């Protein structure tokens, strides 16, 4: 690192369904729990008439507000709207996905009575903001730096879009790293503490909520070298949920002649029940789905066995072996040479997935000594600390990752000429000389593609640019040097120069189809700040409202205290009761006032109650009542805002 990073750096596993954050502290990784006490947080953002919710609170209200609760942004990020996978995904989404700016997906929601449109990067940035806040509340200070993980099989535009999401949140993204590689760090450090030093071939099998990756690494003396990677950015636990949902939808239709899919709220409730059933079936062999008044007042009760669930998903489960075979083939390592098969991602808890893997590796025991939900964030936290300049001996490691897809350009006849083969260690730089196809050709169009097919039309175009001003010459004479340069984030820069004139042009693959422009990112940063300020304002308002309510109840409880029956005059008691009743009615009828108005009301109540409470104090009659303001020895009424209550995590 050329310059040491200011402040602490965190590692964020930005998942399709759940996210997780960790930090290196006191020579170890802390995976941080959120305000609900959970170490993973749903990647959900909800918009209501009054507020924006992120995480558990958003997921908990999804059945009540399906149209405006956004999830699965990771399945949209960096993709084209017309991408068949995106079209397939949006079908069951209860929220609206629209096409914006050419061919980019965006979500449309109602927020505070207005229609708002958000890019997937913005939704992801809100989840990242939540993870950042979880870390800040644990560390007690602001966090600016982060390492964010992506599936190993994410392409260039998906990586770039994830980096943009970090920028919108106001994070300095030190590095984008691959999820299985991050998990391998967690595995490697665990092995290190158990004293293993010899070279190990490790297969990371990472099946999460929405993506699937397999990576094969060799680990020796702190060097983590990725040999090959493969996967499916479109397979995970949600696909298994969908199979259950489809099964119960058809069962319900058969039994009651009603279509659950016609009602977004009913469908959401069914999906939540199916997700719960799937989890239960990982430990039990049978479970029931029970939903009161699912649709048209019909209570739905149905049982499902593990065997039936396995049958419904068997093709998906079996499909997980293909990437495993591919990495073994690409790395030229046989399955008998694999020392450990490491399970990562919540979906690896499914017994059938484990059994198929055991069978594939001829009965080999699977490595389960790292937490599948937390391993990725754990590894990201270690990498963040290293990049921030932490020199702890415990994490003396070097990471050698690879580019997941072949990269090249189009040459005559639509041929894909590969400059960087898949599974090349990154960062890397490759240069090749090309020439013109026609006599006196004044310029060349450089079209950059990624993929494994021999024709560019079957691969994914990343971007294009022109190199013009080539002096007239017969075909094949000009020498055009093209350089592909991949940085440590897996993001590609391409440059071309004419050797005779020295004229050059370059492009950072900003993927005109999927990437946000600098101006768009700046606008989104401003909007993110605005939403954050609104959230904070609402929090302060609720705090003032709760403070007033608590104070009113405490005053009333005090004058009703049996012990004070003899001490307090009946007319004082009556006047306090009336005043408190008036205040509580005021709160009930004024749900949405400004913070200052609630504070003013509390001040008014204190001024009213203080003389009476002071009398009781002077008689020595008042028991210890927490944060009471009596006006005595107090410089400022606002210095004591009534009783505070701690939220229990």
Swiss-Prot record:
Pfam families listed in its UniProt record: HSP70
Region (Disordered): 620-649
Top-rank lineage group of the source organism: Eukaryota
Keyword Isomerase carried by entry: no
NCBIfam families with a match to the protein in the record: PRK00290.1
Keyword terms: ATP-binding, Nucleotide-binding, Stress response
GO molecular function terms attached to this record: ATP binding; ATP-dependent protein folding chaperone
Family listed: Belongs to the heat shock protein 70 family.
Name assigned to this protein: Heat shock 70 kDa protein
Biological source species: Pyrenomonas salina
InterPro entries (alphabetical): ATPase_NBD, Heat_shock_70_CS, HSP70_C_sf, HSP70_peptide-bd_sf, Hsp_70_fam
Gene name, Swiss-Prot/TrEMBL: HSP70
Segments of skewed composition (Polar residues): 620-633
Gene3D superfamilies, alphabetized: 1.20.1270.10, 3.30.30.30, 3.30.420.40, Actin, Chain A, domain 4 (3.90.640.10), Substrate Binding Domain Of DNAk, Chain A, domain 1 (2.60.34.10)
């Amino acid at each position: 690192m050329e310059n040491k990073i200011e402040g602490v750096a965190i590692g964020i596993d930005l998942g399709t369904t759940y996210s997780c954050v960790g930090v290196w502290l006191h020579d170890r990784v802390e995976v941080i729990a959120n305000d609900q006490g959970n170490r993973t947080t749903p990647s959900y953002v909800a918009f209501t008439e009054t507020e924006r919710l992120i995480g558990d609170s958003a997921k908990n209200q999804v059945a009540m507000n399906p149209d405006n609760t956004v999830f699965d942004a990771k399945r949209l990020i960096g993709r084209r709207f017309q991408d068949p996978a995106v079209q397939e995904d949006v079908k069951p989404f209860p929220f609206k996905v629209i096409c914006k700016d050419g061919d980019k997906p965006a979500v449309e929601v109602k927020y505070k009575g207005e229609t708002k449109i958000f890019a997937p990067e913005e939704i992801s940035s809100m989840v990242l903001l939540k993870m950042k806040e979880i870390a800040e509340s644990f560390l007690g200070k602001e966090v600016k730096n982060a390492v964010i993980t992506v599936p190993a099989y994410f392409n260039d535009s998906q990586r770039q879009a994830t980096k943009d999401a970090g920028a919108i949140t106001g994070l300095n993204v030190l590095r984008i790293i691959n999820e299985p590689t991050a998990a391998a760090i967690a595995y490697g450090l665990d092995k290190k503490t158990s004293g293993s030093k010899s070279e190990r071939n490790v297969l990371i099998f990472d099946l999460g909520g929405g993506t699937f990756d397999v990576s094969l690494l060799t680990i020796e003396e702190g060097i983590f070298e990725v040999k090959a990677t493969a996967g499916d950015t479109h397979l995970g636990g949600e696909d298994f949920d969908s199979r259950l949902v489809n099964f119960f939808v058809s069962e319900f239709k058969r039994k009651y002649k009603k279509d659950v899919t016609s009602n977004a709220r009913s469908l959401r409730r069914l999906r939540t029940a199916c997700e719960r059933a799937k989890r239960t079936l990982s430990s039990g062999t049978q479970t029931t789905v029970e939903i009161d008044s699912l649709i048209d007042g019909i209570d739905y009760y149905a049982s499902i066995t593990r065997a039936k669930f396995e049958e419904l998903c068997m093709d998906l489960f079996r499909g997980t072996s293909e990437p495993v075979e591919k990495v073994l083939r690409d790395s030229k390592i046989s399955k008998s040479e694999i020392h450990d098969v490491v399970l990562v991602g919540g979906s690896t808890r499914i017994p059938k997935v484990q059994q198929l893997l055991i069978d594939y590796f001829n009965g080999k025991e699977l490595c389960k000594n790292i937490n599948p939900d937390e391993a990725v964030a754990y590894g990201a936290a270690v990498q963040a600390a290293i990049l921030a300049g932490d020199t702890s001996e415990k994490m003396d490691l070097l990471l050698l990752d690879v580019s997941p897809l072949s990269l090249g350009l189009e040459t005559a006849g639509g041929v894909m000429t590969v400059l960087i083969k898949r599974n090349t260690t990154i960062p890397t730089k490759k240069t090749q000389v090309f020439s013109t196809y026609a006599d006196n050709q004044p310029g060349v169009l450089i079209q950059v593609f990624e993929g494994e097919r021999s024709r560019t039309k079957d691969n994914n175009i990343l971007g294009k640019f022109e190199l013009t001003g080539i002096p007239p010459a017969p075909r094949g004479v000009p020498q055009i040097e093209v350089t592909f340069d991949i940085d440590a984030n897996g993001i590609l820069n391409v440059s071309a120069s004419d050797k005779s004139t020295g004229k050059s042009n370059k492009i950072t693959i900003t993927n005109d189809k999927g990437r946000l422009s600098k101006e768009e990112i700046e606008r989104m940063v401003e909007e993110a700040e605005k939403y954050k300020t609104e959230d904070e304002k609402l929090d302060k308002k609720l705090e003032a409202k709760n403070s007033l309510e608590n104070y009113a109840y405490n005053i009333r409880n005090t004058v009703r205290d049996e012990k004070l029956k003899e001490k307090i005059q009946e007319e004082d008691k009556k006047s306090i009761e009336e005043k408190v009743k008036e205040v509580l009615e005021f709160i009930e009828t004024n749900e949405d006032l400004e913070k200052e108005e609630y504070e003013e009301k509390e001040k008014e109540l204190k001024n009213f109650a203080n003389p009476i409470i002071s009398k009781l104090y002077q008689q020595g009659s008042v028991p210890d009542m927490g944060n009471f303001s009596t006006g005595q020895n107090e410089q400022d009424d606002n210095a004591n805002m009534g009783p505070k209550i701690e939220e229990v995590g």
